[in-house]
Amino acid sequence: MAQTKFRSFYSRMWQKIFSLPINPKLDPKDIKGEYLNFLMRNKDWIYDLYFTCRMPPFTQDAMGDVFFTDDMEMQVIEMALWLSDITKIPLSATFNNIYVRPDQKGLDMFISNFKQLYDVGVKIVTLPHTSWVLTGQIQKEYPELYIKNTILREVTRPNEIVQLAQAGFNYINLDRDLMRDRDRLIEIKEAKEYCAEQGYPVKLS
C-alpha cells in the first residue's frame, strides 16, 4: 500500500512539466475567469507560474519593455500571489535582462529587494547572471530558493550544463534549437546524469 502511494506521488511530480506565464497585459477578469479555470483543470501538469518582475536593478525586461508603473507592478504581484494561493501552483519570479550589469552593486541590490517576494512565498527565480549565482550570496540569504537560468543565455553544450549546475543553478533552460538535434540532446542528457552523480542534480527544460 505504501509503495503504491509512493509510486503515485512520484508519477505526479514527474508529470509537472509545464511552466506557464502570468501575462501582465491580460485583463484581470480574464485571469480570474478563463485562465484560472484552465489552471485548475490542468494544474497536475504545471510545474510553476512565472511572471516578469520589475524591481531594481531589473527595471526593464530583456526587450526594454517599461510599461509598468509602481501600481501596475503591485497588481501583477498581487494577482500572481492570488493565483498561486487558489491553485497551489508555485510562483516563479523572472529577471531575464542579461544587459543589467553583473557587478556586486547590482547583486546587493537584488538580494535586498528580493526579500519582499521571498517572504510572501516566492521560492523560484530566473536569473541572468551565472557570476551572481556562483558567489553563493543569493543562496546564503535565501536558502530555500530554487534558481533557474534564463533561456536568453542560449545553452547548447553539455559542458555548459555542468558549469551551470556547479555554479548553483537548479533548473536549466536549453536553447530551443536543440529540439532538432537528437545527438546533442543525448549528450545533454548524459551531462545531466553526470551532474546528478557528482551531487548537483539539475532539471532541464
Kindly label every feature range from the protein language model.
Residues 146-150, 155-205:
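Catalytic alpha/beta core domains of metabolic enzymes, predominantly
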Residues 1-13:
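Extended hydrophobic/aromatic-rich secondary-structure runs
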Residues 14-18:
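Extreme N-terminal starter segment of soluble prokaryotic enzymes
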Residues 8-11, 39-41, 195-198:
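A general structural signal for short secondary-structure junctions and capping/turn motifs
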Residues 3-6, 20-38, 42-169:
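Active-site beta->alpha loop and helix N-cap motifs at the rims of alpha/beta catalytic domains
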